[in-house]
Amino acid sequence: MTSSSINATSSREPLIHIPNKPSLSIDPLARADRSVHLSPSFFQPGLSSISSENDDAEQRIHEATRSFNQFGHQFYESIRELSESTSAYERLKANALRRKLENTFGNDSGAATSSSSSSVFERQSDFSAFAPYKNSHFDSTQSLFQPTTSFNDRLEQIKSDFIAEHQKSMSSFSGFNTPTTALGAAFQGMQVKKSAFAPVLLRENLDTRRPGGHLISDILNRDPLPQSRNLNLNMARNVPIRLIHSTSNFDIASSSSGDSGHQDHESIVVEDADMDSPTSPCVKRSAMNFDLRDEPLTVNVESVSSTSDLPSSVSSSVNSFVYQNFDPLEFKRKIDELTASACLAVMPDANGQVDPMAIKTQLDAIKKQMEEHQTHMAEASQRLHVDSSLEDSNCEPSPSSSYDASEPSVKRLHHCTHPNCGKVYTKSSHLKAHFRTHTGEKPYECSWDGCDWRFARSDELTRHYRKHTGDRPFKCSQCSRAFSRSDHLSLHMKRHF
C-alpha cells in the first residue's frame, strides 16, 4: 500500500522539498485539492525516536508534578512573597537567597543530568506542558525537584545560614556605609518609620477645642479633656460683658438751642484710640485703668423706639440687661465631660450588658449641670430692673409740674387732659412730651445754618444735630465701629454675641 501511494503521488507531479527541512515536502497541487500531501519520509524515519522522547518527557512531567506538590509550592510562594515585598531590606534578603539557591542548584544540575532523555527534554522543554513549572533561574528541573533527603537537608542549612547572616546589623555588609552606597543606610530607618506595623504614637497634646467631632479613643478616655490648660490672660474674653442702661445727657438735653457741646456722662465705656469724639475725662480715665482679666467689660446698650412718647433714656431702660462673669470654655469643658461619660455609660461591657446604675449616675450629673445653668439664668434675669433714681435724674424739669420736692417720695399720677385720651404718667416731663403729640408743638429748632428742622423733644434734636457734625459717641468695644445713636449700637452688639 505504501508503494502504490508513492507511485500515485509521483505520477501527478514531483514533490517540492523545502530547504532546511529535508523531512518535509509539499505537493504544489495541494491548494487546488484543498488538502496537503506530505512525503512519507516525514513519518517513517523518526517515528520511533520521537515517540520514545515524548513518553520519557511525559513520565518526567508526572514525577516533577508530584514532587512539586510535596515541596515546591511552599518554597516558591515564600520566594515570591519576599520578592514582592515593599521593603527594600526584604527585597535585598530575597535576592541574596535566590542567588545562593541558583549557585547551589547549578552545581547539582551538572552532575544529575547526564542521560540522553534529559538532554532531549531540555531541548523541548519550552514547547511542553511542563512550562508552568519551569523556572528560568535553574538549569534543570530534575535537579530542582529531586526528592532526596540530602537536598532537603542542604536547603534547610542554606536557610539557617542566611537567617543567621542577616540578623546582623546592616552596616556589616561590605561598602554599605561608603559614600556611594550611603542611601542604603536609610533603609532600616525607613522601614521603621513607614512600616504598617510600626508602634502607634499616642497624641498627648490633643486639641480638644476643635470645632469638629471627637475621635472614639477620645470619648472612651476617662479624662478626655486635660485639667491643666494654659490660657492666655492677655486675651480679652468676648462673653463676660456687662450691659447696663445709660445715663446719657445727649438724649435728654434740656437746652432748646440744640448745642452739640454736651458731654456724655455714661458709665464705663472702652474708648477706641483710633476715633476722636467728645468724652468726659473721667470716662477716659476709667477706660485706661480697665483690666479685662479682673472684671467683666461694661458696655452701654439702649434700645430706643422711634415711635415712643417718652424720652429715649426712659423708654429704653427696660431693655437694659446684665451678663454674668461666665467662662464659656469652662462650660464647654463640662459639657464635653458629660458627653463622654454618657457615651461610656450606654456602651455594653465585654458580656454585652449595660450597667443601669452608671446610666443613672450620668443622668443625675446632667440634671445637676442643668440646674446650675438655670441658676445662672435666674441670676441674670434678676438684674433686669429699672433704676428709678437714674430715671428721675435724667428727666427734664417741668415748669408746670405739680410735683413738690419737699413731699415724701410718693409718686403722683399725671393724667393727660386731652379729650378721649386717658393716659397717665408718673412724671410730668413724660406727660409734657406726650401732650405735644396732641398739640403738634415743636419747640426745639435746629441751629445749623440752612436747616429748618424742628422737634418736640430735645433728644430728637440732639440726634438730628449729630448728622450735621458727624459725631458718633457710641463706640463698639469689640471692633472699631461707632454710631450716632445708642439703639444702633445695641443692634450692632448683638452680632458679636
UniProtKB/Swiss-Prot annotation:
Subunit structure: Interacts with E3 ubiquitin-protein ligase wwp-1 (via WW domains).
Residues annotated as signal peptide: none
Keyword Magnesium among record annotations: no
This protein's record includes keyword Membrane: no
This protein's encoding gene: klf-1
Protein's recorded name: Kruppel-like factor 1
GO molecular function, a single term: zinc ion binding
Zn finger intervals (C2H2-type): 414-438, 444-468, 474-496
